[in-house]
Structures are given as structure tokens and as C-alpha cells.
């Protein structure tokens, strides 16, 4: 049975990473969390004391840094220049800064090239904001996973490691992130015309994973 590539897109807090990881496990595929790559760049910039006023320096640092994604017992481990940043890149501070990093065309160009190289041999499940529209436009299966802002905030609140953040603040942050992602000039968040829309507000994680797996199986067996 030939391998395919699976593109999973959607807004912040939709559960893309968890679903993509579980789907990859079930298929025996490699999971690539593109959001973690943008978060890794954001973490590096914050370590360097760079912000949106230093775009030239940001691009220069991004070209030199080395990002590694490695499988771990509880999901993917992320390393920047040999330092593990798996937990560090999930902070609320990173959440609030990653959109402006992702909006820089040169940053996207660097990371998209890496992502396309990773997917060249097939057998990849990749999640992000523009996988089906830009990174892997020829992916055999494309899914756009979404849920209401309230549901996405509630899910993120359950998994947050920040003891200070409130549910209301998360809702506000997600709304802001949606606006930034949808309105950016380079590869905005948009559903690919040939993507399957999966509204998961009333669905369990297991139901979402099963739905995506069914789409993959239907394609491989010619049922699409």
C-alpha cells in the first residue's frame, strides 16, 4: 500500500497537533509539527532580545539556527541549536509573539523549504496553518480542523502550564491570533478548496482521529 501525505490545517487551539500525532502513530507515518518550528524561531528571537523592530536581525538569526524535531514518549521533542525547548515554546509569551514571526516572508520561506524536504518521500502527517494551501498543495488528504473560539480556549486552558493565565485571557488571545493569521499577507489561514472541513466542537478526540483516519483509508483504497 503506497504512502501518502496528510495535511492538517486550522486555527489556534483546534487540536491539530494532538490529532496529527495520533493519526501518524496509527498509520505508522512521521509527524511534523510545523507550528513548533515557528515557535522555535520565536523562542530563539526572544532569547536574543529581538522583536518586530529588528526584522533584518531576526532573518539573519533564523538562517543560522538549527531546528530538530525528534520523536519522544509524549509526542515530538523540539531542539534549537542542541537545546531542548519542547516545553519552553508552549508558553503564553510565545503564543502572543509567534504570529508576527510567522508573518515574515523570509522566515516562512526558510521553514517551508525544510518542511517540503521532510515530506518529499511521503508518509508524512503535517499540521499547521497553510499546509494544504502552500506547503503541501499536492497532499493526498487535506483536513481543515476547527472549533468555536470558546471551545478552543477551554481546551488550551486545560493544557496550559501558565498558572496566571485565565480562560477569558485565552479567549481574547485566540481571537487576536485568528485575526492575525487570517489577515496576514503571506500564506494566510484559509481552508484549501479541496480540504475536508472538520468542525470538532462537539466531537471527542477519538472521534476526530477516527474521522481523519477514515479519510486516509478511503483515499488509499480508492474510495475518494
Predicted regions and their residues:
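Hydrophobic anchor at the beta1->P-loop junction of P-loop NTPases
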Residues: 8
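Walker A (P-loop) phosphate-binding loop of P-loop NTPases
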Residues: 13
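Conserved lysine of the Walker
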Residues: 16
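Hydrophobic positions on the alpha1 helix immediately C-terminal to the Walker A/P-loop
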Residues: 19
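N-terminal phosphate/diphosphate-binding loop that engages ATP/GTP or pyrophosphate donors
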Residues: 25-91
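Small-molecule kinase domains that catalyze NTP-dependent phosphoryl transfer to phosphate-bearing small molecules
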Residues: 70, 115-122, 129, 133-134, ...
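ATP-dependent NMP and nucleoside kinases share a basic, alpha-helical "lid"
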Residues: 86-161
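Glycine-rich phosphate-binding loops of nucleotide-dependent enzymes
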Residues: 142-150, 156-159, 197, 204, ...
Amino acid at each position: 500500500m503506497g504512502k501518502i501525505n496528510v495535511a492538517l490545517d486550522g486555527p489556534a487551539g483546534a487540536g491539530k497537533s494532538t490529532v496529527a500525532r495520533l493519526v501518524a502513530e496509527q498509520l505508522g507515518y512521521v509527524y511534523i509539527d510545523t507550528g513548533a518550528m515557528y515557535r522555535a524561531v520565536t523562542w530563539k528571537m526572544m532569547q536574543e532580545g529581538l522583536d518586530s523592530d529588528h526584522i533584518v536581525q531576526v532573518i539573519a538569526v533564523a538562517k543560522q539556527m538549527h531546528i530538530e524535531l525528534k520523536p519522544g514518549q509524549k509526542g515530538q521533542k523540539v531542539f534549537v541549536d542542541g537545546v531542548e525547548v519542547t516545553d519552553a515554546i508552549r508558553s503564553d509569551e510565545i503564543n502572543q509573539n509567534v504570529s508576527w514571526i510567522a508573518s515574515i516572508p523570509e522566515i516562512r520561506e526558510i521553514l517551508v523549504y525544510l518542511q517540503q524536504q521532510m515530506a518529499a518521500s511521503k508518509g508524512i502527517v503535517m499540521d499547521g496553518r497553510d499546509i494544504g494551501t502552500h506547503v503541501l498543495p499536492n497532499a493526498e488528504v487535506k483536513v481543515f480542523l476547527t472549533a468555536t473560539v470558546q471551545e478552543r480556549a477551554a481546551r488550551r486552558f486545560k493544557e496550559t502550564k501558565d498558572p496566571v493565565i485565565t480562560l477569558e485571557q485565552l479567549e481574547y488571545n485566540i481571537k487576536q491570533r485568528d485575526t492575525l493569521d487570517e489577515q496576514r499577507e503571506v500564506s494566510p489561514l484559509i481552508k484549501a478548496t479541496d480540504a475536508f472541513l472538520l468542525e470538532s466542537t462537539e466531537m471527542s478526540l477519538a472521534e476526530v482521529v477516527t474521522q481523519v483516519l477514515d479519510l486516509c483509508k478511503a483515499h488509499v483504497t480508492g474510495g475518494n
